[in-house]
UniProtKB/Swiss-Prot annotation:
UniProt entry tagged with the keyword Endoplasmic reticulum: no
Protein name: Myosin-binding protein C, slow-type
Modified sites of kind Phosphothreonine: 28, 420
Function: Thick filament-associated protein located in the crossbridge region of vertebrate striated muscle a bands. Slow skeletal protein that binds to both myosin and actin. In vitro, binds to native thin filaments and modifies the activity of actin-activated myosin ATPase. May modulate muscle contraction or may play a more structural role.
PTM-bearing positions, type Phosphoserine: 233
UniProt entry keywords in alphabetical sequence: Actin-binding, Cell adhesion, Immunoglobulin domain, Muscle protein, Phosphoprotein, Repeat, Thick filament
Domain Fibronectin type-III: 244-343, 344-459, 556-621
Modified residues (Phosphotyrosine): 445
Start and end residues of each Ig-like C2-type domain: 1-53, 54-142, 144-241, 459-553
Length: 621
């Protein structure tokens, strides 16, 4: 590319006698190239390489310590306007709602709007043109907090005389704060004394091995870290315990409730029992939840609002004027479970002279206890008086249990059952219940008595729509036709082809209670014809026909004759093929070939006549 100096060009040419100089103002990386100068007497070339100006760090990154939730701004400045990349602990920084990266000229910023503990770490900014990165540390701190949610009113703790107190107070803060317990301005040391403190990363614990009367009073806890301090006072109250010796007993369980009872304390602590508090928890959890805020005056209680299918435990506390007892032992684990809703859509599927088949749909609501099976019962009409009941939305029969005969037990969830061994012309009532681990559902009754007598249902053949016209298949293809039908008792079926019996060695016929199948593995033209089906039940007869046509490729046209040749045209005639492939001829294809090459090309396709004129031939060929 020729360099043309000009007023607005960065290129200038300086001539001093025989010396010519090319001057590039404001050279950039893009100016790196090979430059040539040519004269009438020769040529000279030189390669130019433009490197970036060495960068200098004007303002380095500085380590920062910031409180939790405050904004962090990491800022650095370099001598040139070049981009760069931020990393945290060796990984690229991902921008988001809280974290923004700003590159403005030579100044580069990383802004964290709301500092979290996980934002702590080593941050590095690496400019694209410098090998030495800029490094700083972010240290997030959080003032300590004391969590007293689990204490009684006025931050009071009651301990039973002679028992061990382990008062665990959750604490938070970053870095983890140092905890100091004290009483009456006297520090409680960590160690092995009867009264001692224990420190953990997320809690601080006051331990009294054997509580004594003089241990009552106010205990102070002080937390301190580099972000701040926190203080709290806890009142310790000592009393003689009520003694609950036995765990409560759960006597009945529902879908989200249970009934529990218990024995009064064997010792009332010298003061009459005022009532009881009840707690429950999930078996896999350690968190107990108080169920009553008003004292329960009785020794029985009904917890509610539990989750079906989840194991629970319950325990109780006795209360007198002095205070609250230790908790009782937890009850044995129990699981709230509900019976299913009743089965639905109970209906008669079929009836014979000695059996009745009933079918139904599973319950709409099954629940956590699942579905174990069904109980189906029947009784004969006239066993007892019947009355109307709307409990299930249908007429139901209120019959004594001894009149009902059990037919199926749990273990099968198939919603269908056949009652066998019934006397002909008897009438029976039927009912069904769903069973699961919680017991039996409400009963679903069939709305009316069922007559034990086979009902003749006249036959009916249901020819599929695609078989109502001629069914066409090619030679060698499979034929598989399914013809549904109805009729009771099981109909007698007869197939004929063109009025004659079907050769079962060539055509397979398969019959079931509801359909018949014609199957031909490899169709031949001899399989074409009219197939007649007769379905007979008692004196009732139903007939239907199917036309099957097995087709093949046609034979060649006959008597191809050149009638006339003129110019570049030729007139042809022919007769249809002797073998039409068992289907109407739909057209002809005419091809031509040069005698020298004998390569055939289609001239006319899908032609319906038996004569044609071919044009545009080459004269002399």
């Amino acid at each position: 590319e020729e360099i043309v100096p000009g007023p607005k060009s960065r290129y200038r040419i300086k001539v001093e006698g025989k010396k010519h100089t090319l001057i590039i103002e404001g050279a950039t990386k893009a100016d790196s190239a090979e430059y040539s100068v040519m004269t009438t007497g020769g040529q000279s070339s030189a390669k130019l390489s433009v490197d970036l100006r060495p960068l200098k760090i004007t303002t380095p990154l500085t380590d920062q310590t910031v409180k939790l939730g405050k904004e962090v701004c990491l800022k650095c400045e370099i001598s040139e306007n070049v981009p760069g990349k931020w990393t945290k602990n060796g990984l690229p920084v991902q921008e988001g709602e809280r974290l923004k990266v700003v590159h403005k000229g030579r100044i580069h910023k990383l802004v964290i709007a709301n500092a979290l503990i996980e934002d702590e770490g080593e941050y590095v900014f690496t400019p694209d043109a410098i090998t030495v990165p800029l490094v700083c540390q972010i240290h997030v701190i959080d003032p300590p907090k004391i969590i007293l949610d689990g204490l009684e009113a006025d931050n009071t703790v009651t301990v039973i005389a002679g028992s061990k107190l382990r008062l665990e107070i959750p604490v938070t803060g970053e870095p983890p704060p140092k905890a100091i317990w004290s009483r009456a301005d006297k520090a409680i040391m960590e160690g092995s004394g009867r009264i001692r403190a224990e420190s953990y990363p997320d809690s601080s614990t006051l331990v009294i091995d054997v509580a004594e009367r003089d241990d009552s009073g106010v205990y102070n806890i002080n937390l301190k870290n580099e972000a701040g301090e926190a203080h709290a006072s806890i009142k310790l109250r000592l009393w003689i315990s009520l003694i609950l010796r036995l765990a409560p007993n759960v006597t009945e369980v529902g879908d989200d409730w249970c009934i529990m009872n218990w024995e009064p304390p064997v010792y009332d602590g010298g003061s009459p029992i005022l009532g009881y508090f009840i707690e429950r928890k999930k078996k896999q959890s350690s968190r107990w939840m108080r169920l009553n805020f008003d004292l329960c005056k009785e020794t029985t209680f009904e917890p509610k609002k539990m989750i079906e299918g989840v194991a629970y435990e319950v325990r109780i506390f006795a209360v007198n004027a002095i205070g609250i007892s230790k908790p009782s032992m937890p009850s044995k684990p129990f699981v709230p479970l509900a019976v299913t809703s009743p089965p639905t859509l109970l209906a008669v599927d079929s009836v014979t002279d000695s059996s009745v088949t009933m079918k139904w749909r599973p319950p709409d609501q099954i629940g956590a206890a699942g579905l174990s099976g069904y109980v189906l019962e029947y009784c004969f009409e006239g066993s007892t008086s019947a009355k109307q009941s709307n409990e299930n939305g249908e007429a139901a029969n209120d019959l004594p249990a001894e009149d009902w005969s059990l037919q199926t037990q749990t273990g099968s969830t198939r919603p269908k059952f056949t009652i066998t061994g019934l006397p002909t012309d008897a009438k029976i009532f039927v009912r069904v219940k769903a069973i699961n681990a919680a017991g039996a559902s409400e009963t679903k009754y069939y709305s009316q008595p069922i007559l034990v007598k086979e009902i003749i249902e006249p036959p009916k053949i249901r020819i599929p729509r695609h078989l109502k016209q001629t069914y066409i298949r090619r030679v060698g293809e499979a034929v598989n036709l399914v013809i549904p039908f109805q009729g009771k008792p099981r109909p007698e079926l007869t197939w004929k082809k063109d009025g004659a019996e079907i050769d079962k060695n060539q055509i397979n016929i398969r019959n079931s209670e509801t359909d018949t199948i014609i199957f031909i593995r490899k169709a031949e033209r001899s399989h074409s014809g009219k197939y007649d089906l007769e379905v007979k039940v008692d004196k009732y007869v139903e007939n239907a026909s199917i036309d099957i046509q097995i087709v093949d490729r046609p034979g060649p046209p006959q008597a191809v004759t050149i009638e006339d040749v003129w110019g570049e045209n030729v007139a042809l005639t022919w007769t249809p093929p002797k073998d039409d492939g068992n289907a109407a001829i739909t057209g002809y294809t005419i091809q031509k070939a040069d005698k020298k090459s004998m390569e055939w090309f289609a001239v006319i396709e899908h032609y319906h006549r038996t004569n044609a004129t071919i044009t545009e031939l080459v004269i002399g060929n």
